[in-house]
Amino acid sequence: MSEAKDNGSRDEVLVPHKNCRKNTTVPGKKGEEKSLAPVFAEKLISPSRRGAKLKDRESHQENEDRNSELDQDEEDKESFCRGFPMSGCELETSCCVCHSTALGERFC
């Protein structure tokens, strides 16, 4: 009985409707080729700006390296103060001072 209800919907393939326009391309050009716009855009950039672009990239990489070093320093400070929750010490200050006085000896 379940076979009688099956209307063959599994065998149907959905085909998107076309917008009734003929797809045309420029004669001699395939639709899969890349556009030449980036080549022309590169020619429009002045030589001095090309050098500046390279310097911008290098400085961006240096800034990323510097930021990752700062993040690593912050992680080191956090691990330095780990185990002393709610002690009131700031990560920027030396925590050995407050912990050494509160606990009697240095744990850092």
Curated annotation (Swiss-Prot):
Residues 1-77 are annotated as: Disordered. It comes from Homo sapiens. It comes from the Eukaryota. Residues 1-15, 53-69 have a biased composition (Basic and acidic residues). This is Putative uncharacterized protein encoded by LINC00471.
